[in-house]
Amino acid sequence: MPTAGAVLLLATAAVLSRPAAAANEKKPLTISAAGAVCGFSNELKEVASFAATKVNAYLTETEQLGTLAVDFCAAIFNGNGKPTAGEVYAALLAAKTQTDRQAQQQKLVTGALLASSLCSQQAGHIESFIHVFYQAHRDATTTCIYKSDEHQRKAADVPCVNNGGGLNKITITTRATKPQLNSKYKAIVAGTTPNGAAAEKNCKLVNGEQSQNVFLASQTTNIALKWGDGLLTVPIGDTAISASNWEPNNKDSIASGNYKECAAALEQVPPRQSTATAAASKLLKLEAEDDPKLEEELISKNSFYGDFPISNVKITATDFSSLHSKLKSYRKKHTADGHQLLKAKLQHLEKQMQMNATACKLGAEISSGEPSTAKTTTSGRCEGKAKTACPKSDYRQREEKDGKEECKPKSGEEQKTQTTGAGEGAADKKEEKCKGKLEPECTKAPECKWEGETCKDSSILVNKQFTLSMISAAFM
């Protein structure tokens, strides 16, 4: 049985043989390092804005070229004098350039979407890593983003993080300049930026040793954890973070690392079409108020379609100046004609509205003036009623031979008819004029209409058709 001294000796040996607790690898990121990483991430997110701006500009210019080609033709053929060959070829060049650009639109949009997707995805990886480090903070002795003048880092210290402690969202804005991915990428390892904090602060997120990191406690080996899609690889030895732990270190450019696909896609926005792009830029200058004084343009043989043109053609500087003058004059007149046309349309619309109002008023008058043929006779009000229910003021009672009493109208009341409406003759019994007539007699009478098996008054139908025809005519 071992003695107490032997036990003490064994315990001491075990302690001495255990590796010393590493400290340097728990030194957190500095504010400057986090800021440089966020600067790169923000530039990646700007790719979406740049792509959207370029696509919009490309499509707008392509549409302008189509309008320009049409206006060129109108200006040189509808004006005075015969156009020069150079002016005609300038119009053809505008149309061809538009067609060439339209053929590339699908490629442009696809490339813009690819660049936006790749770069935004990688920005998300980076910002998620920074956000985890930002949240891993308990007190002045435990933080993973260290600020030298005060331990309590704030959202304002980390450009990726908003005031609420969350991550900033991507917003699409107008951006004409290409994002500077490479310079932001290399800035991460510039100077002392990539180095860990001077004090320990106990950040185990940057410790890859399984005995020192609770997240790796079940591992049997040390692991070089990678953060931000490989942007940062944590040390596993007793060393602090330095430039060697960051991916941009010893890289010539962003094209050599994990972000090369994003950078390559960005280079294709917009697609490189030097000929069409240069021609478009040149021709669109002719829309300026003042003569742009363009230099001559050479149209090479067979450069348009097939074997056209059959020889080289020059559009001289004089041709461009003449075309600019004719285009300006045509558009000025065209604008004036457009104003006159708009004025005429407004006047026509005003008259139409007046006609509509008149037709509606006329229709209302016709509708209110229609006679009602709803007949109320004394027999309808009294026939079949018992003696006690017969109105005494307008009717009398008579006893039949069989002893039954009936309600009968007074003398002269049988043919009374209530009519409504305005106008002379509204109270006439129009329905009575047609009622009972046979079909041959009914069809000959202008005020009657044979309908089914009955002869009816047609005045109501005529009035309605007249009103509808007036309203329809007013709105045509």
From Swiss-Prot:
Compositionally biased, Basic and acidic residues: which spans?
A: 393-416, 426-439
Q: Propeptide positions, renumbered to this chain? A: 458-476
The disulfides recorded in the entry are C38-C160, C144-C203
Q: Name one GO cellular component term.
A: plasma membrane
Record bears the keyword Membrane: yes
**Cellular localisation:** Cell membrane
Q: Looking at the record, which segments are called Disordered?
A: 367-439
Tell me which domain of life the UniProt entry assigns to the organism this sequence originates from. Answer: Eukaryota
**How does the record say this protein sits in the membrane?**
Lipid-anchor; GPI-anchor
Signal peptide location in the record?
Answer: 1-22
One Pfam family named in its UniProt record: Trypan_glycop_C
Q: What job does this protein perform?
A: VSG forms a coat on the surface of the parasite. The trypanosome evades the immune response of the host by expressing a series of antigenically distinct VSGs from an estimated 1000 VSG genes.
The name on file for this protein is Variant surface glycoprotein 4
Higher taxonomy: Eukaryota, Discoba, Euglenozoa, Kinetoplastea, Metakinetoplastina
